[in-house]
Amino acid sequence: MTRRSRAHNEKGQTMVEFILVLPVLLIVLFGIFQFGITFKNYISLTDAVRAGARTAAVSRYSASRVADTKARVKTASDLSGMADSDVDVQSTWAHGADVVVTAKYPYRISLLGVVLASGDLTSSTTERVE
């Protein structure tokens, strides 16, 4: 076999190996991408809950403290589709008592229309009422 024909055969082999490995590489890339989006949403949710808990901690005398807290959580996050029912505020509102703000945000990971995983991202923060 001459050098030229051997190199030509190896070029075809390389192409076949690439085609076999490509789906695995794409799935790994997709997984990294989806994990990044989900993690970004979790960080945004955590920051929004922290901002809402801080608002609740300083609004002890406000008549609309729960509504204000829920509104603060929703506006502090850049997550779309968050409803009032997704945010929970618990406290006795006494000076020095704890206020617990919990929020959830649904996530769904799908590949080509097939849902691989779904659930709720949940974050909770506790602050002391001032």
Predicted features by range, described:
Residues 2, 51-130:
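Short, conserved structural patches
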Residues 2-73:
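Alpha-helical assembly-interface signal, strongest on the long, hydrophobic N-terminal helix that forms
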